[in-house]
Amino acid sequence: MKKNVVLLGCSNLLGMHHAFRQVFQHTQSDAYETETYLEDDYAKYTNLAVAGGGNALIKWRLFDFLEHEIPDYVYLQFSGLVRRDFYFDKESIENFELEPTTSKKHLYIPGGNHVHEKNAKSFIHRLQNASYNFYDDNTNNWHSLQDIFSAVTVLDKLKIKHNWSIYYDPINPPTENTKMEGIIAKWPAFIDHSNKLSSPLNYAIDSGVDVPDGVHFDYDTFLKYLENNKSKIHLNFDDK
């Protein structure tokens, strides 16, 4: 039976299902693929990463997927703690000027790094303005940590093999831009770290990789990151 692998994150995880396939299957052979889906003779990969997505969106998309399907392995790459996402019933899509991410039932508005909109006119901009404190980059951290807890805990409860990380280390943010993504002094005791991996962005910078925008690492760096953490990742094709 094919391995069912699911990835969830923000823009730093877009396209990175190819890196998982390259590291764990040692192949770049032909496969059926779309922007978010890849399938070969041994595995199918679903990449639910969304540019600008925060940790609530990652949690919601995970729960949406688990409602219909139980994968063999999940990798969660959490995003900036400060990001505030929103979801609405899918039937209300006509009320939005932008094109949101959708699931079978919901549409999602990614939090991203929201900039205060002066004289905001659209519903979304007014909602975002009301949801961020522009004098405190840590205003949404506590809610975001609860989202991480919920996502990790449901995978534990369902006994789904998984790993998780945050794209940057919120205790030691490596760049000025990640300092604005939310900083914490320590992790709350209620989050289980047994399947946690180190930050790929911190890995990139510690390895001497140039990260021009202080946020996004490239494919080759993530490939090396997976190889470096391979022994800790609970994805195994030895039985294939």
Model-derived features: positions:
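Serine-esterase "nucleophile elbow" of acetyl-processing enzymes
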Residues: 1-57, 61-68, 218, 223
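Alpha-helical cap/lid subdomain in secreted, periplasmic
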Residues: 2, 63-240
